[in-house]
């Protein structure tokens, strides 16, 4: 055994010496390689804008549409009024507890819409919960051959993240059941969505706020629902915010929940090299924030990012309120924040 070890050692040394004397670099077999996230380049791939006669698929990758037939009919009417054709996901009205069918059924509807080159946009019917359960079932191979717009917000943030990390733009906007009390789509929401999908430049002027932290920033707009951004941390669907402007909205949370999620984003580096933050609607907060936290929500957020000097815009009309304007995620924007007036301009 001793002599065998001597022979093995001699062979190893001989191989090392040969490798050192070779004019070619030795072949190294990597073990346990850790691939770091790669920052997305400045310009993401933009799916083709819609034109009259194009087809849009309406699917529900998350919550069920129980008693929502009238709302979907209104969604179809809206798209038809833009001279667009509509197809519905085969399983869109299925129910599996709170979901629109099983994970397999919801994934199948979304996959068919991704794969069909004749479908030019996918409009998600609603959020709720369930999108994260189908993320790893989706195959974007055909999507990359024939990119299309994916539209939605709230729980659809998970898919926006996934598409962003593939290098494509998507649209954060109203969904198929986003109707007002009159069972109609508010014009202030429908008009910018139409502009976004047909290629008209989006530019918003927002009333100022004394809580705003003034400044000017340029960068890709990324983000969405805070809970979903927090849920994605540590996964391949988390996003790189370096050099970008982060949009956040939330609904139905207590102050300490919001603080905890923001602190988690901070610890994950979301604010380290961020260019700016746009805060959308923080809606239907549970409890009395002044009684529970002692400060308004704006100050809670400013406290989390106090060591950074980027601009912070509050009260942008996007999120879980009736006024929910379209945002093109992945598009470069110019953000100008003031206490009297602020602007968000998308660069076409």
Predicted features along the sequence, with ranges:
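Bacterial Sec-dependent N-terminal signal peptides
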Residues: 1-31
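Short Gly/Thr/Asp-enriched flexible loops that form oxyanion-binding sites at enzyme active sites
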Residues: 127-145
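A short helix->loop->beta-strand "cap" motif at the edges of active sites that frequently abuts
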Residues: 118, 144-149, 168, 274-275, ...
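ATP/nucleoside-binding phosphotransfer catalytic cores, i.e., glycine-rich phosphate-binding loops
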Residues: 281, 285-348
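Conserved anion/nucleotide-ligand pocket segment
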Residues: 169-234
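ATP/NTP phosphate-donor binding region
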Residues: 29-118
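Internal helical hairpin/lid segments
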Residues: 240-296
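Short, acidic/small-residue loops that bind anionic groups at enzyme active sites
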Residues: 140-163, 169-175
């Amino acid at each position: 055994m001793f002599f065998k070890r001597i022979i093995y050692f001699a062979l190893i040394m001989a191989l090392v010496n040969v490798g050192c004397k070779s004019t070619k670099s030795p072949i190294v077999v990597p073990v346990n390689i850790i691939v770091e996230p790669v920052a997305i380049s400045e310009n993401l791939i933009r799916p083709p804008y819609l034109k009259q006669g194009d087809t849009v698929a309406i699917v529900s990758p998350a919550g069920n549409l129980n008693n929502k037939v009238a709302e979907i009919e209104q969604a179809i009417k809206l798209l038809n009024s833009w001279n667009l054709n509509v197809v519905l996901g085969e399983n869109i009205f299925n129910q599996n507890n709170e979901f629109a069918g099983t994970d397999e059924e919801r994934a199948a509807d979304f996959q068919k819409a991704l794969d069909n080159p004749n479908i030019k946009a996918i409009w998600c019917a609603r959020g709720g919960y369930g999108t994260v359960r189908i993320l790893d079932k989706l195959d974007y191979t055909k999507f990359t051959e024939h990119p299309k717009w994916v539209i939605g917000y709230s729980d659809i943030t998970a898919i926006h993240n996934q598409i962003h990390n593939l290098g494509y733009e998507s649209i954060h906007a109203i969904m198929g059941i986003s109707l007002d009390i009159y069972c109609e789509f508010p014009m202030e929401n429908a008009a910018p969505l139409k502009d976004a999908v047909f290629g008209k430049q989006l530019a918003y002027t927002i009333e100022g706020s004394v809580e705003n932290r003034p400044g000017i920033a340029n960068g890709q707009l990324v983000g969405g629902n805070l809970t979903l951004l927090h849920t994605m941390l540590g996964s391949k669907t988390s996003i790189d915010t370096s050099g970008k402007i982060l949009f956040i909205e939330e609904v139905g949370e207590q102050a300490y929940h919001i603080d905890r999620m923001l602190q988690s984003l901070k610890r994950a580096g979301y604010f380290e090299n961020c260019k700016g933050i746009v805060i959308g609607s923080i809606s239907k907060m549970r409890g009395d924030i002044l009684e529970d936290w002692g400060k308004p929500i704006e100050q809670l957020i400013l406290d989390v990012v106090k060591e950074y000097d980027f601009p912070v815009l509050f009260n942008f009309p996007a999120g879980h309120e009736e006024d929910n304007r379209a945002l093109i995620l992945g598009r470069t924007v110019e953000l100008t924040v003031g206490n009297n007036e602020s602007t968000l301009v998308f660069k076409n």
